[in-house]
């Protein structure tokens, strides 16, 4: 039942455990389970502006295939390091790396105008997008879909 499934999620002691519970659900693969986990970590207005789970987007991430390829592009060949370790390093050192590279990164701010670092979950996404960007820019691959503009929708004005 859904109640039993959700109870397993509530009993989980880490985001990685929640991910495994989600993956165990019929129809949930690695990608969907991770995306649902990430969504469950956002604060909900109907839940008092707190997330359903007691974890943050910086506690754990599951690198998908694109992120793994992005990490491989960043590292020297045959470096024996766990992908999550690389993502955590990027998260911890992002500000000093932007400074070292003389990049004026446009960090987002929270509701109190405090600058927010790029979360571990978003670093995972960035690594995937980095991989796609490099393969397209170097002509070694293409995007999944070709962009075609849709026809404008015309609304009747009364």
Q: Model features per residue range: what roles?
A:
Residues 37-103, 109:
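Phosphate-backbone recognition surface of nucleic-acid-processing proteins
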Residues 98-158:
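Low-complexity, acidic/Ser/Thr- and charged residue-rich accessory regions of DNA metabolism proteins
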Residues 1-26:
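Helix-hairpin-helix/helix-loop-helix acidic hairpins
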Residues 23, 53-54, 117:
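A general structural-boundary detector
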Residues 5-9, 18, 71, 86-90, ...:
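Generic structural signal of hydrophobic/aromatic residues within well-ordered alpha-helices
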